[in-house]
A protein has these predicted regions:
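A metal-dependent hydrolase metal-coordination microenvironment
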Residues: 2-127, 131, 138-140, 145-147, ...
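Catalytic cores of secreted or luminal carbohydrate-active enzymes
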Residues: 183, 191-206
Length: 206
């Protein structure tokens, strides 16, 4: 029988979550509590991506835990009665937190506005990921209008638990079939407690 390795045989692999929220925005746990919780579950890397709040929690870093600095931005579309009927959420994660420059966090749902924000964020030192398009009421063909995303959330466990809308395989398939490049990631989008869903990273950024 031939042994097949799902993970790289001779490389270091880190367990990471690239999307979570603390009491700095609408999360239920402090940044310190999140660190303790994720470390207890075997995580090495945690991206703090609070809504419209960019902070680098450098003091939380230690030999076995790396906090990533980031934030989540949203772009909203409302109907005539001011009800939200479509949104686009993106995560910006700093490559070098000491050099990255955040931009304004809120915007309207227009393709050119979103693409411009992604472009500026990349120029300012961030990788930019598209969050939970199914939950955001974005169809697979709609995401093809966007450019510059480093990755798409293939799965978001918070959206699955709350609205059964966390799976985004069709969006990623459409993305690849259109010739666009991007990684697939899974995240728990934690607002309260950790779901044991590892994201295994060979390298954080390319």
């Amino acid at each position: 029988m031939t042994r097949e390795y799902i993970l790289p045989e001779n490389e270091t692999v880190y367990k990471a979550n690239l999307h979570c929220h603390s009491t700095c925005s609408d999360g239920a746990m402090s940044t310190e509590e999140l660190k303790a919780l994720y470390k207890s579950k075997g995580y090495n890397v945690l991206a703090y991506t609070d809504h419209h709040t960019y902070r680098y929690h450098k003091d939380l870093a230690d030999e076995t835990f790396l906090p990533l600095a980031g934030y989540e931005l949203n772009f909203d579309k409302f109907d005539s009665k001011r009800r939200l009927n479509k949104t686009c959420h993106i995560n910006a994660i700093a490559i070098d937190p000491d050099k990255a420059i955040p931009i304004e966090g809120k915007g309207i749902y227009k393709v050119d506005v979103i693409n411009d924000a992604v472009k500026r964020l990349r120029e300012n030192g961030f990788v930019v990921n598209l969050n939970h398009p199914s939950w955001s009421n974005q169809g697979p063909e709609e995401v093809l209008q966007f450019d510059g995303f480093t990755a798409i959330e293939l799965y978001n466990s918070c959206c699955t638990r709350t609205y059964n809308s966390g799976e985004n395989q069709s969006h990623y398939d459409a993305w690849l079939k259109a010739g666009k490049k991007g990684f697939a990631i899974a995240a728990d989008d934690n607002h309260a407690s950790c779901n044991e869903l590892p994201v295994l990273c060979r390298r954080l950024f390319s």
